[in-house]
Amino acid sequence: MSSFRFTQVNVFSADPLGGNPLAVVHAADALSETQMAAFARWTNLSETTFLLSPSDPGADYAVRIFTPGGELPFAGHPTLGSCHAWLAAGGQPRQPGRIVQQCGVGLVSVRSDGPHLAFMAPPLLRTGGLEPEVLSRITQTLGVQPSAIVHHEWVDNGPGWCAVMLSSASQVLSLKPDWSALGPLKLGVIGPHDPGHDAAFEVRAFISGGYEDPVTGSLNAGLAQWLIGRGLAPRSYVASQGTALQRVGRVHLCQADGQVWVGGEVVEVIRGEVTL
């Protein structure tokens, strides 16, 4: 057995008990995929990441991202949390203020912007309106009439997200999903807040197995690409997520030079070693 540096960080909130936690194992090149998957099941967090030496010369570090159910090619809050952990451990990017992460979807750029880290949203792998059978499953899951869905789209950037927009944030917050109807879908739901709220939209993320993700970077990335691209959201806005779970997070979205950036605060909560 070997010991590895370990940190647990909180992403998308300055509150250590808000946002979405992430477990990070550093310098994990010696671990097998089986060991990584087993440790991710043990932590039972939405994601656990393993920092590795990059194989791509353009990357500062590599990361593998695991949920308790398996590996993901990309996820948003693990990208920001892993980057924060790498920097806090003394990582030095090749280019000041810009960090390049290697993961399952290739290279992802991360920038340091004051108290925030922000990643460049990866290209969408699937777009377009949702199929009738998918919409039928969603309305059954959410317990709403088809007319309650004002817009819908595939926003898949790796995890497989589909998304619907409701007419208000209050509708989003009132949802009590029928988990048995969701099936294999990974569903994002978004609705606008009233003027004067510190966030423009409320977001919720529903995943099969009865799980609601507290704050989801990949989903918010896909939502921003869709909504900004269609003129349904301003080029810069803040999304709130986790409210229904009392884990309020804030995700900062902006479009610059044709690219969508997804940012938020990250704080370290636990530091130590793990023996595996």
Regions found by a protein language model. Give the residues of each.
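Active-site proximal loop and beta-alpha junction motif in alpha/beta enzyme cores
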Residues: 1-74, 80-276
